Amino acid sequence: MTKSGEVVHQALQAFMPQEGGVYDSIVSNPPYFHNSLKNPDERRAQARHTDALPINVLFAHARRLLTPTGTLSIIVPTDNAELYLSEAYLHGFSLCRRCDVRTTPRKMPRRSLLAFALTHGHMVERQEAVLQAADGSRTPWYAALTADFYIR
């Protein structure tokens, strides 16, 4: 049986794959607050602010760790998405998928799910998703996405 996934609790900057291995996919919920008021809890501040993992460092290490056909998938605030798109381009990545997520149909998107590849020339798959219907219930998309996390 081959290994299909691995979770490592370590700073990306210090991570060295075993046997010079590279990965087909990297998924990250990177810190995304820039120059904003920090939480007094050091762990929360590290998880939320880019001081510990600047955007350029994320892309540089993703490039180092991905196969030539691998993808980097991240979730970021929609209002910061352009910053990530620009940085991705500077590191040789191109956007292959984008899903902008709204909490309700009437609100603007709050989060963007972005997938980048090192290969170029493909069409960008775009989608918009909504978490809650107007009545407050989970949308079918969100219910299907999170079904495995709920007790039945």
Q: How would you name each of these model-derived features?
A:
Residues 24:
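Conserved acidic residues
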Residues 52-109, 113-114:
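Conserved Class I SAM-dependent methyltransferase catalytic core
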